[in-house]
């Protein structure tokens, strides 16, 4: 999977290590020297998410005091990890679909589009197939992001991974604390 440019959808319960898998795919890919940009799609309001993903120009809205590059542009040449994509509002899904299909983004408040070269890895703990059926997730976007679906089993079913994950967490915390 890492050697391809295919869009990947990571499926699994909260806490299964989906971000760790996404980082691993990125680090083993030809895009490893490019940025790995994470966006939690469920943590932001719709308007903030749009600005976060696509950027905005000065004056686009009340608090837009300066131009801001979006996460898609920041990930150019690398990978964007769209965590909790199942939480994204339908109106934002349309905008994301356009970015995925056209390989370009438009900053909020701008008429100009910018070409992007990013690999997309998305993750969810929801059953997106069911979400498509009940109308809370777009069918066309689902098929665009699930080119390579990977199910990550819960940690309780793969206890042999616990020491590896614990080492990673300790190393990560230690480097953040400069120890």
Task: Tell what function each PLM region has.
Residues 40, 148-161:
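Conserved AAA+ ATPase "SRH/arginine-finger" region at the nucleotide-binding site
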Residues 23, 144, 148:
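ABC-type ATPase nucleotide-binding domain
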Residues 162, 166, 170:
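Conserved Sensor-2/SRH helix of P-loop NTPases
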């Amino acid at each position: 999977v890492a050697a391809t440019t295919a869009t990947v959808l990571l499926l699994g319960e909260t806490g299964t290590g989906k971000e760790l898998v996404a980082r691993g795919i990125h680090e083993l890919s030809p895009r490893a020297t490019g940025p790995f940009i994470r966006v939690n799609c469920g943590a932001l309001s719709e308007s903030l998410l749009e600005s976060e993903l696509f950027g905005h120009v000065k004056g686009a809205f009340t608090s837009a005091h300066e131009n801001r590059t979006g996460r898609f542009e920041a990930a150019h040449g690398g990978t964007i990890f769209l965590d909790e994509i199942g939480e994204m509002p339908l109106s934002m899904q349309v905008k994301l679909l356009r970015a995925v299909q056209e390989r370009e983004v438009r900053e909020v408040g701008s008429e100009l589009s910018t070409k992007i070269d990013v690999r997309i890895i998305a993750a969810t703990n929801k059953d997106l197939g069911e979400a498509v059926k009940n109308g809370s997730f777009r069918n066309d976007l689902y098929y665009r992001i699930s080119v390579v679906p990977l199910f990550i089993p819960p940690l309780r079913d793969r206890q042999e991974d616990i020491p590896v994950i614990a080492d990673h967490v300790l190393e990560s915390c230690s480097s953040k604390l400069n120890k």
